[in-house]
């Protein structure tokens, strides 16, 4: 998938909707044509309305307007869910296919894109605080007020959840989903404000300066915490705490010299 933070989504909307639609359409359809019986589509919690009820249950999908800054990306991901559901409905029995969908919340971890503007919030802040530290900068700027709340999921937990969901017996998966609402949320279950997140990253990196909040910049949805009850009832919970995940991610940044 083509992914990025608020700046990238807002700056390159055509690329985000076109590339994601093309990627998933080609993969899902060609998987079907080539006899792939089981497939897992990864969506995003961006699929839900900007002002969805919190924590966000799976049935909040298509109940309201999306966050404008990432609407093209969200629409492409919604299309991917509906494509999987449609193929299941039309070809599930005749071709014995089982295409499933999970919706992870904000991801982070090793191998991320650490671009200071086009990446997601955690890798972007890791880079900004690191550069602030080595340059002895008096302050580091953060987009928005710092008040929005997010749920962050470490990449290893995502991988674990993907394997767990894919390995579920079909009758069990079907029991917890419906034909027209077949996706499953994946999150840590813990929310944190962007302000507190920035303070945590500052501590992990070892930056000693101040944090400035740029109120002129975009900050997205005010709150985005997914409800994990469906996945928890299927026997899975996230294991990696935020502080541990941030430390591992910063170590990855340092080891791989991700200054591009």
Protein language model regions, located:
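Glycine-rich, phosphate-binding/catalytic loops in enzymes
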Residues: 13-16, 55-59, 118-120, 159, ...
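Mobile, glycine-enriched helix-loop/loop "lid" segments at the mouths of ligand-binding/catalytic clefts
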Residues: 46-55, 119, 124-133
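Short, solvent-exposed loop/turn segments at secondary-structure boundaries
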Residues: 112-117, 153
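Hydrophobic alpha-helix immediately C-terminal to the catalytic Tyr-X-X-X-Lys motif of short-chain
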Residues: 79, 83-87, 121-125, 197
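Short, flexible, glycine-rich and Lys/Arg-enriched loop motifs at helix boundaries
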Residues: 53-55, 59-69, 129-142, 146
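N-terminal Rossmann-like NAD(P)+-binding domain of SDR-like oxidoreductases, especially those catalyzing
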Residues: 1-113, 248, 255, 259-260
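Conserved active-site region of classical short-chain dehydrogenase/reductase
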Residues: 21, 25-29, 82, 123, ...
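C-terminal substrate-binding subdomain of Rossmann-fold SDR/epimerase-dehydratase oxidoreductases
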Residues: 125, 131-260
């Amino acid at each position: 998938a083509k992914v990025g933070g608020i700046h990238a989504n807002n700056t390159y909307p055509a690329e985000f909707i076109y590339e994601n639609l093309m990627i998933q359409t080609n993969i899902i359809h060609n998987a079907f044509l080539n006899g792939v019986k089981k497939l897992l589509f990864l969506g995003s919690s961006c699929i839900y309305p900007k002002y969805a009820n919190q924590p966000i249950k799976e049935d909040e999908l298509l109940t309201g307007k999306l966050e404008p800054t990432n609407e093209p990306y969200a629409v492409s991901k919604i299309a991917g869910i509906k494509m999987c559901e449609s193929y299941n409905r039309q070809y599930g029995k005749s071709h014995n296919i089982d295409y499933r969908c999970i919706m992870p919340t904000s991801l982070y971890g090793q191998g991320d894109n650490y671009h200071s503007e086009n990446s997601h919030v955690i890798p972007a802040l890791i880079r900004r605080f690191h550069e602030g530290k080595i340059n002895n900068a008096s302050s580091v700027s953060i987009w928005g007020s710092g008040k929005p709340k997010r749920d962050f999921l470490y990449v290893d937990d995502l991988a674990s959840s993907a394997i767990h969901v894919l390995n579920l017996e079909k009758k069990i998966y079907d029991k917890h989903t419906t034909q027209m609402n077949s996706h499953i949320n994946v999150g840590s279950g813990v929310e944190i404000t962007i302000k507190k997140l920035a303070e945590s990253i500052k501590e992990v990196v070892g930056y000693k300066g101040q944090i400035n909040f740029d109120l002129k910049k975009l900050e997205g949805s005010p709150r985005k915490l997914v409800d994990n009850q469906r996945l928890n009832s299927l026997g899975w919970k996230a294991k990696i705490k935020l502080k541990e995940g941030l430390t591992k991610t910063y170590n990855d940044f340092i080891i791989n010299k991700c200054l591009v």
